[in-house]
């Protein structure tokens, strides 16, 4: 077992205690819990290494910082794992549940929280070793995470370790490790007995934007689920169609999410990357985790914002730090309505991030009711007919205009750029808004 709190290295105990008494001042919009634990871990690691403190700017991810801290230093991996557990509060939380005759709900919740924090820190350390091309330390951390810390490795954990092996040309080890990952991850998956087999016809085939033996980039139409576990329905999901179309896809993320590395909301259209095998899946997950994948979205939003307005939004999503760059590229103004076309580049990949962030600056996505608050509810209540017609195809709040127009990622060491123009419905609506706006201003 990892050492209990009382046996942790004195520098680690002192650092954790100091940080608990004097938490750091947080940048606007950052998650207090996530930032505090990250800062505690960073301080504890640097102190334990006996290394000078390294400057870290707001744009540097935790794993990149840890890689810089570990670079050139001989550090026993189990020591890093001990620091992770200590900073997450895992020894105390585990002991509180293990020693209690009947653990309280609060104690169990605290253990679950500590395991969640520890898992996130473990993954950051694995990504750091991945950056350092140290596949053996990645593998060891997965073992320590599972056997000693009591944290279940997830698809990200296995992907970071497997891609480190593949990048080091240890294909045999990577293959064996991914086979083990399939078995471990399937044990924690509850089978969906209600899922019915859906029929996929040839006319449903996805538009292929890019393809190799290992990956494919396809166009997801608006209104299609990315994978079947997102909700019930008789219509095939993108994963269903892709499996029928390509014949074989990765299953590292579960049998109901075959090939899916990153999802898009049902109303969102655009580029989706698929992994055809688990080795490619692990590499793509690593690229997403290390922010090597860049995406550009186009969104139609409500509100009056000047042309060229924009900036960087730093606002947590579901308690996790999130950042997006945005810019207004066209405005549409009528007598009683105002819209804007914005370009958004998410720097992180949280669920509903763009929807949350645009609503946070007073420009919710046109048609999106979920994140509309306060005065935003009164925006464009007298919408033009072209907008009303475009939103009339489904229930209120289930249609909005968001398109993943460009994705860049690496394949075999080369940078790949995949573009997909706006869908006809989106483009036609912009043309009609432009015409109506020009008429109103004349």
Enumerate the language-model features and the residues they cover.
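Hydrophobic anchor position in alpha-helical repeat solenoids
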Residues: 44-45, 65-70, 80-84, 99, ...
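Pseudouridine synthase
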Residues: 235-242, 278, 289, 336-409, ...
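N-terminal chloroplast transit peptides
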Residues: 1-20
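Hydrophobic packing position at a conserved site in alpha-helical tandem repeat units
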Residues: 69, 73, 80-94, 100-114, ...
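Pentatricopeptide repeat
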Residues: 38, 62-63, 118-123, 127, ...
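RNA pseudouridine synthases
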Residues: 7, 21, 25-28, 33, ...
């Amino acid at each position: 077992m990892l050492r209990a709190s009382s046996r942790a290295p004195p520098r680690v105990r002192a650092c954790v205690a100091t940080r608990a008494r004097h938490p750091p001042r947080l940048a606007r919009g950052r998650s207090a819990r996530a930032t505090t634990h990250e800062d505690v871990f960073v301080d504890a690691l640097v102190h334990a290494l006996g290394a000078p403190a390294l400057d870290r700017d707001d744009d540097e991810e935790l794993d990149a910082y840890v890689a810089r801290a570990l670079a050139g230093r001989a550090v026993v991996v189990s020591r890093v794992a001990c620091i992770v557990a200590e900073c997450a509060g895992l020894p105390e939380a585990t002991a509180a549940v293990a020693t209690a005759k009947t653990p309280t709900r609060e104690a169990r919740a605290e253990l679950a929280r500590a395991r969640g924090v520890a898992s996130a820190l473990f993954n950051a350390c694995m990504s750091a070793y991945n950056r350092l091309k140290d596949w053996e330390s990645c593998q060891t951390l997965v073992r320590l995470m599972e056997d000693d810390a009591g944290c279940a490795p997830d698809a990200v954990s296995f992907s970071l370790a497997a891609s480190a092996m593949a990048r080091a040309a240890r294909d045999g080890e990577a293959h064996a490790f991914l086979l083990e990952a399939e078995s471990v991850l399937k044990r924690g998956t509850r089978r969906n007995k209600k899922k019915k087999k859906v029929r996929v016809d040839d006319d449903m085939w996805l538009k292929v934007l890019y393809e190799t033996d290992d990956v494919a980039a396809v166009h997801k139409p608006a209104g299609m689920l990315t994978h079947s576990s997102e909700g019930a329905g008789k219509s095939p999901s993108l994963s269903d169609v892709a499996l029928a179309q390509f014949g074989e896809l990765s299953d590292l993320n579960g049998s109901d999410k075959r090939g899916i590395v990153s999802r898009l909301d049902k109303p969102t259209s655009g580029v989706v990357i698929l992994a055809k095998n688990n080795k490619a899946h692990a590499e793509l997950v690593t690229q997403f985790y290390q922010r090597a994948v860049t995406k550009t979205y186009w969104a139609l939003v409500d509100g009056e914002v000047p042309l060229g307005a924009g900036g960087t939004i730093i606002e947590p999503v579901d308690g996790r730090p999130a950042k997006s760059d945005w810019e207004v590229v066209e405005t549409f103004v009528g007598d009683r309505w105002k819209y804007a076309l914005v370009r958004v580049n998410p720097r992180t990949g949280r669920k509903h991030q763009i929807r949350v962030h645009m609503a946070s600056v007073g420009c919710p996505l046109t048609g999106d009711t979920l994140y509309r608050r306060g005065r935003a509810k009164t925006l464009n209540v007298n919408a033009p007919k072209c907008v009303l017609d475009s939103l009339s195809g489904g229930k209120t709040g289930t249609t909005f205009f968001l398109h993943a127009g460009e994705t860049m990622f690496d394949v075999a060491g080369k940078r790949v750029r995949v573009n997909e123009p706006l869908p006809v419905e989106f483009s036609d609506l912009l043309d009609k808004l432009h015409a109506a706006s020009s008429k109103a201003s004349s």
